[in-house]
Amino acid sequence: PQSVIHSMVEFKDGGIIAQLGTPDMRLPIQYALYYPHRRYLGGERLDFAALRQITFEEPDMETFLGLPMAMQASRAGGSMPTVFNAANELAVSKFLHQEIGFLDIYDIIAQSMERHKVIENPNLEEILAVESETYQWIESRW
């Protein structure tokens, strides 16, 4: 609810490392772009004294329909996360360009995942091909 935890990783020993920051996606995006290096980012810093506590809730799978699909893609593994990501990227772009409605985003992702036959251990060439095929399939239908 405070929107300050941008990512967490749990290790096999049970330890968890989290990236925290102000409710602003610039920091996690910058981290992803420049990893393993760190760059200066101006702006507000997270103030733990003002924050006082961090609370957690179960995710609302009915409101955030993309979350169970992302979890399904992760469990399926192989090339399925590529399909999820490609379908999500293109569907969101189509929504932002007013080519589809908001709820169509979820239909596009679900249908893209349903039709995909998972490649268990894809190499880079296969991942790029799956991404391209997913884009082409969506473009031909929406």
PLM features: what roles do these ranges have?
Residues 1-142:
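Catalytic, metal-anchored helix/loop core of enzyme active sites in primary metabolism
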